């Protein structure tokens, strides 16, 4: 969906997250900046992340580097903990929760990307918590039941917020 959203809105810049996990089979090396724990921890110590989190149960670290100046809006793909951190740094940040249409669809997507059973179970458990907390915290919730429709809805929200920054 993010790739489609970037096609629809050239004013968006996608922030490339860092992670300590290994690259999945078939995953593009450009999907993340893949680093070891020591490199990640050094970046934390240097204040180099806008937000970061350790994913529960896996020990993998994920983080969004402090953004360089950009002319457009910055798009972050982050977890709930990261969203809390971003809101503390920038209370005006717009949070859009994008969800799968159902828990079964979420599980199918995780299986489709090649995750192992243990990882799928952890993701689903975390996903249940994030759905509950995220819907309370998010400014907008979009159900990703169709990539083009969901990307279009997110693009519409962004256009609306640009036109009326204080809108809710």
Q: What spans do the regions from the language model cover?
A:
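Conserved phosphate-donor/acceptor-positioning beta-strand/loop module used by diverse small-molecule
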Residues: 75-79, 88-111
